Amino acid sequence: MWRTLSAPEQDLVAARIDSQDPFNKYGTHAGEICESELPFYPGARLLRVTNRTPAVGSRYFIQRGDDLVPLHRLPEVQSFCDDRFGLVLDSRTAADYFRFAHYFSREGESTSLVEAPHDLRIDSSSSPERRQAIAFIEPLEITRDKDGVTVTACTFDEPRSRLYRDCYRLTPGQPLELLSREDSGVNLDSSFHDRLLQIGRPDLPVPHHIAASTE
């Protein structure tokens, strides 16, 4: 979950960011800085730095101690961070690890995770087509084995207004891989998704299928 930093905390983070990158001054121009714990990278926190100019968008950093990594400069965020921060992958961290990996992947550039109908602001009183979308949307399904996790997740492609059910393979130290995609056949041309990365979903139950291989 995101927490907005207090003014003194924000000043410290902004100064640290700008000391590392004085040219862009993301800290100086920050409108709001929020933090979220990353349970799969023990002791690390994710920082979301929102620029005062909306067109600039947000920048993300991971901080642990004196180590501050600007994620927008990395070609492969998740695989780099696995090596840099030391991954802990278990039933407690698997869902958030996948959310993080998907958001910063090539797939995450074109699709957003949809874990419940309210992620797209769809309610049960909607049109028949939207009720069809509600029936299609399912929570994450995670199967964990000794080499990583396989995840089934619903995603939304906003430019195409399409809702999918995707299957991914996530192996520590390697980029997220899309294995298969099922199209819902539903056109959601007026749906809204804010594309915010959500670490921790207290509004949702724990993903209903987490199975560790005994092999």
Task: Describe every region a protein language model picked out.
Residues 44-46, 146-150, 173:
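A generic structural signal for beta-strand entry/edge sites
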Residues 1-133:
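Extended, low-hydrophobicity segments enriched in charged/polar residues
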Residues 171-181:
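Short beta-strand edge/turn micro-motifs at domain boundaries
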Residues 56-57, 135, 160-166:
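Short, surface-exposed coil-to-beta transition loops
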Residues 140, 166-169:
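Hydrophobic/aromatic beta-strand elements that line small-molecule binding cavities or substrate pockets
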